[in-house]
Amino acid sequence: MRRTYHTILKERFHRRLWYERIRLDWTQAEMAEQLHMDERSYSDLDTGKSCCSAVTLVLFLVYVCEDVALFLEELRNAFEAGTENAA
C-alpha cells in the first residue's frame, strides 16, 4: 500500500510541478533555485523520473504552488482512488 502512495505522489507532483513551472514561465534552472536544489535533481522531478522529498514538497507548497488546497484535494482523491483499486 505504501508503494501505491509513493507512486501516486510521484505522478501527481510531477504533473503539478511541470504545470506551475509553465504557468510561471520559469526555466528548470529557475524552478530548481526556488526549491533549493541542483538542476539535475530538479530535472528528474520535472520529468517524473524521481519523487520529491518532504522538504521539496513543503518548499513547493509554500513558495510555488498557486492553489495549495486544490493540489492537496486532488492528491487526496488520487490516494483514495488508488488505495481502493489496490485493495
Model-inferred region functions:
Residues 53-71:
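DNA major-groove recognition helix of helix-turn-helix/homeodomain DNA-binding modules
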Residues 20, 34-35, 45, 74:
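Residues in the recognition helix of alpha-helical DNA-binding motifs
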Residues 25-44:
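Short alpha-helical DNA-recognition segment
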Residues 16, 27, 53-56:
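Residues that mark the N-terminal boundary/hinge immediately upstream of a DNA-recognition element
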Residues 2, 7, 70-87:
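Short, charged recognition helix plus adjacent turn
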